[in-house]
């Protein structure tokens, strides 16, 4: 496992933990799952992909991005890296795309 993969795994685990233990927003706490994290080579930026059980993912995406500084603060307390990357949260739509493909395949039967 490369160093970058280890950093991504560490951030994944810690952000998921922050969502459960430190965030008061129940929509985020109960309905959001981190699916993937991609960190830039210089560790200055990280894109955090998430899914949600709710249909209002745009609202949740805005709420999470509004909490970026809080999440970064807690990361700095728990993760020992030279630099904590700037975070950008993006809804992971692969599940929705998969559902659409399944519906199309069902119509072909």
Language-model features: where?
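Charge-rich, low-complexity N-terminal segments
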Residues: 1-45, 51-109
């Amino acid at each position: 496992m490369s160093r970058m993969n280890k950093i991504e795994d560490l951030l994944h685990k810690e952000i998921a933990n922050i969502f459960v233990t430190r965030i008061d927003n129940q929509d985020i706490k109960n309905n959001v799952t981190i699916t993937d994290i991609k960190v830039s080579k210089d560790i200055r930026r990280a894109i955090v992909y998430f899914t949600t059980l709710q249909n209002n993912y745009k609202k949740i995406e805005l709420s999470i991005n509004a909490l970026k500084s809080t999440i970064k603060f807690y990361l700095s307390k728990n993760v020992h890296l030279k630099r904590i990357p700037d975070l950008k949260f993006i809804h992971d739509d692969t599940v929705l795309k998969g559902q659409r493909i399944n519906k199309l395949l069902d119509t072909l039967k």
